[in-house]
């Protein structure tokens, strides 16, 4: 006997099909923009969710430059952050290097750019999803990411 009911199973399989279609579309768009690396589809999805901008700096990110950008872990791997889409943002190499092994809160909260950063995240909350938006601004991001990704 299955642990999922018939309706839940149908919804789950629909979700899987929809996500597969979204990933395929993102890979196709990335290829059209000239991106060649394996993570280009994921980068395109992140770029779209972020409204074509680096959340950390506000800098515009161009689809034609996907290969120049990096996928950053919101909660760094060094702090136990998982390899999970929930924990990824697209950013520039410079911003990634500046952030280093810190959460966005540790890195930006004491700077003049914090309020503008929080506003950028708030404006994109629907596209980013609430959990990711929370991770991006929380002083407790390390704890939150474990709760959000625990099985």
Regions found by a protein language model. Give the residues of each.
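Short, charged surface segments at domain edges that flank catalytic/cofactor-binding sites
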Residues: 2-59, 81-84, 127-149
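Non-transmembrane, interaction-prone segments in cytosolic or luminal domains
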Residues: 11-17, 45-47, 60-63, 90, ...
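Alpha-helix initiation and N-capping motif
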Residues: 23, 54, 68, 111-114, ...
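Domain-exit/linker segments immediately C-terminal to small folded modules
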Residues: 86-87, 91-151
